[in-house]
Amino acid sequence: MTRLSAPIKASMKKTATALTLACSLLSVMSISQAQAADNIDVSFQTILQQERNWAGLQSKSLKVGDITWSYSEGGSSTKPTLLLIHGLAGSRDNWNRVAHYLTTNYHVIIPDLPGSGETIVSQDFDYSVPNLAEKLRRFVEAANLKGPIHIAGHSLGGSIALLYAGQYPFETKSLFLVDSGGIFRSANTIYLKDPTYLKQLLVSKKGDFNYLLKQTMFNPPFIPKEFLQAQEKLMINQAPQTQKLVDQLIALNKVYTPDSFAVLTKTIDAPTLILWGKQDK
């Protein structure tokens, strides 16, 4: 993986600056109590759609093989393409407030990963990181995204982005990793050292989402109760798929060592920016 030289830093300035300023907003959506309608599900979806509109995004779908991908697209297709990959138990909407800063200068593509958001897969789907990276490549090809493209990944999305860039180095223009998952020599959190701890973060019953926020945010923001309930309900519904993803991460950690994981990414030659906050877990 290359380090950034001065010329490369200059060429990445717009992408890196916009992403760095915006990434702190991942997974946080500020809404007022007045926006919460009696019908929580309808209100929640309405708010998400309002955020997509505000970010300049349109909801689209694309069938590739046996997967019907749900994704957001914004910006002119004549601009450089930027692929944003969400994290574990997340969805494309985690990037809405980030995308707001990007759609003016980039062709932004944000898919729901298989088993997340509105991208539905079969019960026997292989949730391994290598397979997710391969399926993502098939999506990029079917969407006719002209490479090389910029790729940003958060959490699990960072692991997928790493493998994608390693397998398709000539199709990757730059790489931006936010709190990336993976198997590293200098892992500094319990979740990277031992993914079994991720099971503690599964949202499978009422009350779990509050625990998740406390564990994953240094200073959790105020979120109206109606929004919390709607988000928790969605995550409970997706708990079986999230459990399978966690199981695959645990299996990956047993199969690969830091050295063997590094081999998977040794062909990455794209300029890479890694962001990890002081309090991030």
Regions found by a protein language model. Give the residues of each.
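Alpha/beta-hydrolase fold catalytic core
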Residues: 2-81, 104-106, 147
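Active-site loop/oxyanion-hole signature of alpha/beta-hydrolase fold enzymes
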Residues: 55, 62-74, 110-152
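Conserved HGGG/HGGXW glycine-rich cap/lid loop of the alpha/beta-hydrolase fold
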Residues: 67, 72-118
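Alpha/beta-hydrolase-fold catalytic nucleophile elbow
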Residues: 112, 178-179, 215
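Gly/Ala-rich beta-loop-alpha elbow adjacent to hydrolase catalytic centers
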Residues: 153, 157, 161
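Flexible "cap/lid" loop of the alpha/beta hydrolase fold
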Residues: 162-167, 173-205
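Conserved alpha/beta-hydrolase catalytic His-Asp/Glu region
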Residues: 186-192, 202-267
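Short beta-strand/loop motif that positions the catalytic acidic residue
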Residues: 267-268, 274-276, 280
